[in-house]
Structures are given as structure tokens and as C-alpha cells.
Amino acid sequence: MGIRAIVVDTAGTTTDLNFIQDTLFPYSSKALADFLEENQTNVLVDNCISDVKDIALEPDASLERVVEILQQWIAEDRKATPLKTLQGLIWKQGYAQGEFKGHIYPDFIDSVKEIKAQNVRLYSFSSGSVDAQKLLFSHSDGGDLTEYFDGHFDTRTGNKLFKQAYLNIINTISLAPKQVLFISDVLEELKAAEQAGMRVMQMVRETTQRTGDYPQITNFKELSF
């Protein structure tokens, strides 16, 4: 059964992890307090603030306290949905103002056309919000790549470390599990996807990276169809 869809992880796979850690995270951390102060009456932002209070079990938390909680979550790289939603909104500002461009590895930029030419669908799955993924790929240093994607998935689909998230993706895209290839640098994610029946492949871009018994590539040009 041939591959009909590829699902890619972002950080460490399509995108340099350093861009996330050294550019995006610090930008959202620095802008967070002002952004919440200026946008707290926005329905989406207000809902995120409420969700933060719920998750932290602090229903009466002040806005200042919410900022403290979110800053701690950023430092911990916590995959909380309200944090990821707010980060996406803040990054949207940064992209629009030209503060940075999304880093995408050149080999992925070169490969997306070939993937589409082979009639293979392309999706991304990240702990970052769908909106943040769209921003990354639409404002990339290789131009707007969104036309090559058939969809994006985030924490609303499920935790990347658990099988159910990948079962949800399979159900959404309506393909047999073995028709879907998941590519990530993280062993635990590959294990979860494999448990869901997907084919998996580890992206190994760093020599210091933990590796397992999965098929490996060092860049997307090594993919064969």
C-alpha cells in the first residue's frame, strides 16, 4: 500500500529548533504582558485567559498573575492550548511587522513541490497552534508555502506523545493508517504514531540526537516515493 499522505512535525524536522527557542519564544515572552493588556476584551484572548485560570486552578487570578503563569509555561515549554493560541496571536503581530521570517530548512522547501507532484497530501502536526503553523509556512524565508499543504493539526487533535492523536488524524484525513507517513525527530512521537498504525520515519538533523530503530533520513531530499 503506497504512501498517500505525509504528516510532518515542525520543530526539528521542517524548522530549526533554535528558531523556535531563540526567536519565537523570547518574542512572545517579551510581548506577552502588553499584548494581554491591550487585547483582554477580545473574545478569543479573553477565553484563553479564562482557560489559563482553569488549568492553573486559580479562578480569581489577576491579569498580572495570568502573565506570570504564562511566562512560567513558556520557560517550561508547556504544551498548553491557551498558551499556544496566545503565542500564535503574538507571533502574527511579529510576522506582520517584519520582526522575523519563519525558518524552514531549504531541503523541505525544495521537496514540497515533488511531494505534491506525486499526488501525495501534505499535513503538519505541531504543539504550536494551527494559526502559528500557517504563519510559519506563509511567512517563511522560502516564501509562502501554504499552497502545498492540505491541512494542519495541533494540540486540539491530541497530545503528540499519545496514540489517540494519530488515530484522530487518520480519521480526519480518511486514509488507511499504512497510507500515512509521519516524519519527526522525536522518538516518543514516532512510537505513538506507529502504535496508531502509521508508517514512521525519524528526521536526524543533529549528530547528538537520540535515535531509535526507525527508518531515518537526514533531510527531505532523501525521501523516495
From Swiss-Prot:
GO molecular function: 2,3-diketo-5-methylthiopentyl-1-phosphate enolase activity; 2-hydroxy-3-keto-5-methylthiopentenyl-1-phosphate phosphatase activity; acireductone synthase activity; magnesium ion binding
Cofactor(s) it depends on: Mg(2+)
Keyword DNA repair: no
A Pfam family annotated for this UniProt entry: Hydrolase
Catalytic activity: 5-methylsulfanyl-2,3-dioxopentyl phosphate + H2O = 1,2-dihydroxy-5-(methylsulfanyl)pent-1-en-3-one + phosphate
Keywords: Amino-acid biosynthesis, Hydrolase, Magnesium, Metal-binding, Methionine biosynthesis
Annotated metabolic or biological route of this protein: Amino-acid biosynthesis; L-methionine biosynthesis via salvage pathway; L-methionine from S-methyl-5-thio-alpha-D-ribose 1-phosphate: step 3/6; Amino-acid biosynthesis; L-methionine biosynthesis via salvage pathway; L-methionine from S-methyl-5-thio-alpha-D-ribose 1-phosphate: step 4/6
Entry's cofactor comment: Binds 1 Mg(2+) ion per subunit.
GO biological-process terms attached to the record: L-methionine salvage from methylthioadenosine
InterPro entries tied to this protein: Enolase-ppase_E1, HAD-like_sf, HAD-SF_hydro_IA, HAD_sf
Broad enzyme group: hydrolase
Subunit structure: Monomer.
PANTHER family tied to this protein: ENOLASE-PHOSPHATASE E1
Function in brief: Bifunctional enzyme that catalyzes the enolization of 2,3-diketo-5-methylthiopentyl-1-phosphate (DK-MTP-1-P) into the intermediate 2-hydroxy-3-keto-5-methylthiopentenyl-1-phosphate (HK-MTPenyl-1-P), which is then dephosphorylated to form the acireductone 1,2-dihydroxy-3-keto-5-methylthiopentene (DHK-MTPene).
Protein's name according to its UniProt entry: Enolase-phosphatase E1
